[in-house]
Amino acid sequence: MTNELHFPDVIDNSMRKELVKCQKIAHWKFERGLNAEIGNEHLVAGGAFAKGMEVMRKMYYQDGEKQAAALQEGIVAVYKQYGQFVPPSGSLKTAERMAGALAYYAENKPFDGEELVPLQLGDGMLGIEVAFNHELPILHPKTNKRLSYCGRFDMLAEDKQGKVWVVDEKTTGRMGDAWAHQWDLDSQMSGYVWGAQKLLKKEGIDKEVVGAVINGISILKYGYDTMRCPTFRQDWEVLRWYEQMLDDVDGWISAFKHQDHDQILDHGCALYNAPCQYAKLCKARDPEKIVGSYAIKFWNPMLRD
């Protein structure tokens, strides 16, 4: 084995998603830090759009600026966050297109007509770009300290009836009914609602988090589109997600201790005609001979990098 085994102190949805897909992915990616893909256009583009929205919302709601001025600063933030990343040839998620998506969203969803506004938090700040990190009742397999689960979403908002919603923007391709309904059982949104509920309780805010609102922004070849998808989460659904997440992490710890990880070994190894980045390792009789072809970069859930 060419690099030391690592087990994360903090778990997030990206980790759990890979873990339940295939424990071996969790081994290669999070225990070993192996990466063939440095720089993901979807993460870079989505992060740039999110930064633009954050800046625009803070200037409008927190600083009292007009939306036109807030939009201009948001566009600057998109380019800055996108940085020097070079997307694949033919990609629709260039820096220019993401800046255009922000302008399109601002025009079609003006803040002065918005039904969901940032919640006032206990520290006097507004619920824009909200992060949480809550302890779990599970001990780290090496340090024996408690693990935690973290998340970060775009806004914690209140509607006109006083109900609280997690709000998250998603950039994507074409949207339709299937895209809208995928969020009803989505683990990321369930985790965000759980995290928001605990956050409000910790801050002494007596309000109910009823679910999540996903604002979809499609980046099309000849334009853009938007779709708003509310998805409710009842208390029993959040509890079910939480207990399942704990079971998944417990299973990962057991696999880590014994270094015996379940593998999918089926079509999931090449979903949508895109082979898993670790497929060649699983195909090799002695994968340790070729792990050197991968870069070492451990996922940091707190920084989303």
Where are these regions (language model features)?
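RecB-family 4Fe-4S metal-dependent nuclease core
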Residues: 1-305
